[in-house]
């Protein structure tokens, strides 16, 4: 496994985004928190793939690919892969709705303080698990 400059840049971007999530939450931008938390998790997992020498596909949830390459994963990620995969899938499901909404789904009305706090918790958890791998 290697670390590369782009993967480390992804880690730095994720750290900034996590701080931004807290600001967005304080401002009541709950749907924005959900959307940005998904992007944070996505970039973290793509950073791990880079460290493993795997080209990240242009999709938003790479948890299946991580499972397919479980033999290459470092122990901390392997031990937490179920949790990381669940977080990635859950946030991915909300990605577009949190940003664009729909005629019957207004993001600023649908996402709550609790949804926002949960999204922050998920992003922080993935950061905690994968940051030692990328550094």
Task: Please report, for each region that a protein language model flagged, where it lies by residue.
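Terminal alpha-helical segments
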Residues: 1-135
């Amino acid at each position: 496994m290697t670390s590369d400059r782009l993967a480390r840049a992804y880690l730095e971007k994720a750290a900034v985004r996590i701080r931004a999530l807290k600001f967005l939450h304080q401002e009541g931008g709950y749907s924005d928190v959900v959307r940005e938390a998904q992007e944070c998790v996505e970039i973290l997992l793509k950073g791990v793939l880079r460290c493993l020498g795997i080209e990240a596909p242009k999709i938003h949830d790479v948890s299946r690919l991580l499972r397919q390459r479980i033999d290459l994963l470092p122990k901390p990620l392997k031990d937490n892969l179920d949790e990381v995969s669940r977080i990635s899938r859950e946030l991915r499901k909300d990605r577009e709705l949190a940003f664009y909404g729909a005629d019957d789904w207004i993001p600023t009305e649908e996402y709550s303080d609790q949804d926002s706090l949960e999204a922050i918790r998920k992003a922080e958890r993935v950061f905690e698990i994968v940051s030692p791998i990328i550094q």
